[in-house]
Amino acid sequence: MPPRRTKKLKTIPDTLLIGSIFTIFENLEAHAYLLPEDDKILWDQYFSEFDALKYLPTRDGETLQEMLSEGAPSTSVLHSEMELSIFDQVQVPHPSQTTNKERYMMLMDGIKYVLGSVTRVNAEKAGDIIKDYNVPVNLTEREMNRAKAFCNGWQSVXLNESGRKLVMHSAGGEFQLK
């Protein structure tokens, strides 16, 4: 019989992930407003930025990609109108009826909605996101407040005594950036 594995205590990944997501969104939102509408290459690049998030596991155990692509024939996680049906409350229009900027902003709103259910990610994935986007490990008070407002699944979010680390409390326990 193989030896029983000790369950590893989750610490960094969840909080790191949340800080990463906000930093990514902030950068993308800021730049999207500056992009020329007719620059197809740049817009394709910006739409593809979301691929980094598609393997994140959600509260239900599915990856974000699985949630988005249920019933959709396209392998592209964020480009198919069928895949966007999960964002009914966001009402993403067909590309022919809107500009790239408008579609992009609505798409991000939808993804933010789905990411509200993200509660865990393994350390390797979190590390990749941090590395790819140069996300700082320490969160500012503003980022912490955004995390608190965004992740309504958490019972409480607060800075620790030093004022630089994020501590999150949920039904699953406490998570803190070490």
UniProtKB/Swiss-Prot annotation:
UniProt GO BP: plasmid partitioning
Entry keyword set: Plasmid, Plasmid partition
Entry function: Plasmid partition require REP1, REP2, and a cis-acting DNA sequence (known as STB).
Protein name as catalogued: Trans-acting factor C
Organism per entry: Zygosaccharomyces bisporus
